Amino acid sequence: MFHQIWAALLYLYGILLNSIYQCPEHSQLTTGGVDGKEFPEPHLGQWYFIAGAAPTKEELATFDPVDNIVFNMAAGSVPMQLQLRATIRTKNGLCVPRKWIYRLSEGNTDLRTEGRPDMKTKLFSSTCPGGIMLKETGQGYQRFLLYNRSPHPPEKCVEEFQSLTSCLDFKAFLLTPRNQEACELSSN
């Protein structure tokens, strides 16, 4: 009898704690009002990769050699398509160009990477001015990534991102050093 009462009290205590300490909600961005011919203007242009979070360090390992990454997001050549170009500055100073195409899903900003059917990307708003968050999932990994219009956003932005992702049980955290100058983006 005592064990049943104790279990019930612990259960109620858990419910109470869960209701008090819930993770803050971040709304997923949508294409609301867009006629399918272009992506919402505020999200096009240049972005800097600031930080990442994942359940394990292995899911962030691809970013270990990175000092900084600068991206350019542009409307694609066909409706519901985005073209991304990036230049990665490695910690040893090399510049590595990359480009890929995202396909938008109708009515929201779920992105599918062309040539990688297992990869899914969702865009989320950020409380940080000039910021955006992405959640990438694929075969064997999931991670949140923080981007900003500035290569050096306020420290509070990074702290809020880390707090949010930690609350979601993403315990591994990576902050890009951004010690070197960003590489120039190629125009093609």
Swiss-Prot record:
Disulfide bonds join C23-C167, C95-C183, C128-C157. Pfam families: ApoM (PF11032). Gene3D superfamilies: 2.40.128.20. InterPro entries: ApoM (IPR022734), Calycin (IPR012674). Tetradecanoate binds at E136, R143. GO terms for cellular component: discoidal high-density lipoprotein particle; high-density lipoprotein particle; low-density lipoprotein particle; spherical high-density lipoprotein particle; very-low-density lipoprotein particle. It is found in: Secreted. One of its GO terms (molecular function) is phospholipid binding. Residues 1-22 form the signal peptide. Keywords: Disulfide bond, HDL, Lipid transport, Secreted, Signal, Transport. Probably involved in lipid transport. Can bind sphingosine-1-phosphate, myristic acid, palmitic acid and stearic acid, retinol, all-trans-retinoic acid and 9-cis-retinoic acid. PANTHER family: APOLIPOPROTEIN M. Interacts with LRP2; LRP2 mediates APOM renal uptake and subsequent lysosomal degradation. Belongs to the calycin superfamily. Lipocalin family. Highly divergent. This is Apolipoprotein M. It comes from Sus scrofa (Pig).
